[in-house]
A protein has these predicted regions:
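S-adenosyl-L-methionine
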Residues: 1-145
Length: 145
């Protein structure tokens, strides 16, 4: 069988980004009726067509980029440029992120803290892969819980 596209010569149904799979990145829901929201994605995850993934060449910028993508500035730009319910990777890649050296450490630290708080909150629910026990049972004794 020939799995190549007759027009382009590329093999169909093939992952062209093998260098990036399972790498740390930023993901977002591509289809949303609400505001754009980006999430940190740790190593070991795959992207999909409605859960796109942004990979940074320099991973030390990941939390800075995550903070920018979740900012009011990005939200306003995306409301103008993505007037449908679909947040496509091309639109996200066109956002004008500028790294400000004077604020880099502070923004990165705040973003990292927000990711930790969100993860801890998510992990308190049974649907999380990292769920251990309900937060109501976190007291030192069952009686204090």
């Amino acid at each position: 069988m020939n799995f190549k596209d007759e027009k382009t010569g590329r093999i169909r149904s093939h992952n062209y980004n093998l260098d990036y799979i399972f790498q740390e990145g930023i993901t977002w829901t591509a289809l949303s009726s609400g505001n754009f929201g980006a999430r940190y994605s740790k190593q070991g995850k795959l992207a999909d067509s409605k859960g796109s993934m942004l990979y940074l060449h320099n991973t030390k910028n990941t939390n800075y980029a995550l903070a920018f993508l979740n900012s009011a500035v990005s939200s306003h730009i995306l409301k103008v440029t993505s007037q449908t319910l679909d947040f496509k990777p091309g639109r996200i890649s066109e956002l004008p992120m500028k790294i400000e050296d004077n604020f880099f450490e502070m923004i990165t630290s705040l973003s990292r803290d927000a990711v930790t708080i969100s993860k801890n909150d998510w992990d308190s629910f049974e649907v999380s892969w990292d769920f251990e026990r309900h937060s109501l049972l976190n007291g030192p004794t069952m009686q204090s819980s």
